[in-house]
Design a protein with these regions (language model features):
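A general structural signal for well-ordered alpha-helical segments in protein cores
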Residues: 58, 85, 127, 147-148, ...
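Glycine-rich phosphate/pyrophosphate-binding beta-alpha loops
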Residues: 5, 113-144
């Protein structure tokens, strides 16, 4: 993988975009779509521009935060999601500031892989689907940027409903 965000190197999900119809549809879920081999080399990520490092990092973060607050959670999903959240919290800013920081790139690659795997052992919530609709209509909108745009209102809704306060506290601690 050349970026740290989608986690697609370890899951069986993808997105198909049809710009002619403004559709962006998630597809997959079949065992036959699991990758056979994943090469996750942080050195390949060293030249990714800072803003795309940030967008991809937030994509990885939101895969895990969505999964962590979803009802489809387990000990396994909690473990990989919290590992991803912790690594994003500690290393994303460093990777954005200095793309050649290999320690930060390595930890972001790990966070990305764990976030991808979190979709195998858990699930995303509706935030990703909502963003797909946005970037389907606005083809120049990077996916991670769209997620950032809606994240405050999205997560505020769950906080105000007090539906998973303990999970938000655990995520905040993991983020540092």
């Amino acid at each position: 993988t050349t970026t740290a965000g989608t986690g697609s190197e370890v899951d069986q999900w993808g997105v198909v975009t049809n710009p002619a119809t403004n559709e962006k549809i998630g597809c997959g879920g079949m065992d036959s779509l699991f990758p056979t081999l994943a090469v996750v080399d942080p050195e390949l990520m060293a030249t990714v521009p800072a803003k795309f490092t940030a967008y991809q990092g937030f994509d990885a973060l939101f895969h895990s935060t969505e999964g962590f607050i979803s009802k489809a959670n387990s000990l396994m999903s909690d473990m990989v999601q919290l590992a991803a959240i912790e690594n994003v919290g500690k290393y994303l800013a460093r990777a954005v500031r200095d793309g050649s920081d290999m320690e930060a790139r390595e930890h972001m690659a790990f966070a990305n892989t764990m976030s991808g795997y979190s979709m195998v052992v858990g699930a995303c919530t509706s935030e990703h689907a909502m963003e797909h609709a946005m970037s389907a209509y606005h083809g120049d909108l990077p996916h991670g940027a769209g997620l950032i745009m809606i994240s405050k209102e999205y997560y505020t809704h769950f906080v105000n409903k007090h539906c998973c306060d303990d999970r938000f506290i655990r995520m905040a601690k993991a983020l540092g």
